[in-house]
Amino acid sequence: MRKKPVVIGVAGGSGSGKTTVTKAIYEHFQGHSILMLEQDFYYKDQSHLPFEERLKTNYDHPLAFDNDLLIEHIHKLLNYEPIDKPVYDYTLHTRSNEVIRVEPKDVIILEGILVLEDERLRNLMDIKVYVDTDADIRIIRRLLRDIKERGRTLESVIEQYVNVVRPMHNQFIEPTKRYADIIIPEGGHNHVAIDLMVTKIQTILEQNSIL
């Protein structure tokens, strides 16, 4: 009988290095059966709201995410069933009509700022990871990313950080660190921690007779 896939949850604040960590794990197991599932794709559909209301969306609050759909999709993947992953349109601030077909794999990496906040999600994880990076490093990374990649102004990024990102991080994201099995300081630059994670994943896969 085929064992269930391994689920790794990777959480941490915006700009902490979550994506760098998940990519490092993904690249290590490239050639094996592995997929990345980003929580950002699972923001709630807001097509029923006027555009002006959508502009007020707080993307750093737990209620912004459609965790019910995410959990449903993880259950399907655990049963080796394909899913149609939603696509979020940040220009319209709602879910796109497009979907991405995702085939089941033996390793599922679930990455997002609040993947450890929902107990139902945590209960599906074999390994829970929190990427812990100093606030000044996180804001610098966010500034560079949003200005360069998203065409934001310096003033708008700082205003959002002060009024939304920082308070939401302190209220909802940082407290989820206590649920982590592994805390990775310095994000993706902590090669020792990443190597330990890879070793743990390999052990679970071997126990599941997948490797």
Swiss-Prot record:
GO terms for molecular function: ATP binding; cytidine kinase activity; uridine kinase activity. Pathway: Pyrimidine metabolism; CTP biosynthesis via salvage pathway; CTP from cytidine: step 1/3; Pyrimidine metabolism; UMP biosynthesis via salvage pathway; UMP from uridine: step 1/1. Its EC number is 2.7.1.48. GO terms for biological process: CTP salvage; UMP salvage. The keyword Translocase does not apply. CDD domains: UMPK. It catalyses: uridine + ATP = UMP + ADP + H(+); cytidine + ATP = CMP + ADP + H(+). ATP binds at residues 12-19. It comes from the Bacteria. It is found in: Cytoplasm. It is an enzyme of class 2 (transferase). GO terms for cellular component: cytoplasm. Gene3D superfamilies: P-loop containing nucleotide triphosphate hydrolases. The keyword Transferase applies. Belongs to the uridine kinase family. PANTHER family: URIDINE KINASE. This is Uridine kinase. It comes from Anoxybacillus flavithermus (strain DSM 21510 / WK1). The lineage of its organism: Bacteria, Bacillati, Bacillota, Bacilli, Bacillales. The gene is udk.
